Amino acid sequence: MSSTEYAYAVANVRARESELLDNRFFNQLLSGTSFEEAKRMLIDKGFSEFENTSDISAALKNYMEETWEYLQEITPDKNVLDFLVVKNDFHNLKALTKGIMTDTDGIKYCLKPCLINAENILNAVKNKNFSDLPSWISECAKEGYGLLSSSMDGQLFDMFVDKCSLEAMQKLAADDFSKKLADSFTALTDIKIALRMARAGVNEMLYDYALCECDRVDISELKSAALKGYGNVVSYIEETEFSELAEYAAVSAAEFEKNSENYILALLDNARRISFGAEPLIAYYAAREAECRNLRIAVSAVHIGLPAAAAKERMRELYV
């Protein structure tokens, strides 16, 4: 599809960018003296859901779903954005499979937007009709079910499905920018996992369940470094294109994770400046996702009386 076919969609997103919350607003939100004051600020910004509830999750439930529906309406090629939300389908697969195993309701833990109706995943797994699911998730659903039913190890199951999620994201990434973004995200996730596993001194087998192949890191070398210790992973990072993040990894895995997300947002910040193509739409969705995450942190902080400085340490950069 020609990039010029995105001209209308890009112009539409440009107009919407002015509605994104900026750092100034978040500073005001965190400086509020009460949860009720924070709610009023959000209601004034258009978050009418806060008028009827103090449940942060409930109020923000439709936040990203509305963003997704809007982008689907204006995007010439509906599939080009699929790689952005496929992680929710794998989250839903985890919730539903565990629900089946424990005879509990997994549906209530499912996320939207997603590519597959959660009920369809539930029926496929419950009836073991895994082939009813799209190819990018069917084998994972089958193997994951077998893994969980035989081991009843929820952590191992989570690792396996999360790896499958990264593989699917790379598979569904359609254009050069999407492929770069998906591969970079996978590489940074692999490094984050290696840092945490190295610190914990986990069994070597777990690395094979957790690390996902990608172009920007060699997972065999990363695994080898992690097995030698945390500091060796930091040294490995210094030899990759993510060398600028090594100093944060030296502080902690959490500090690396925060700054790796900011690294991805920097890629997206450059992408949104492109005049034609899907890149600005991808960047807009990611910006809304970062905004949503920061909202949860900020509103929760005000609700429980967490100091603003502590909340800001957990928040991610915004591109507005």
Q: Residue spans of the language-model regions?
A:
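N-terminal domain-start signal
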Residues: 1-320
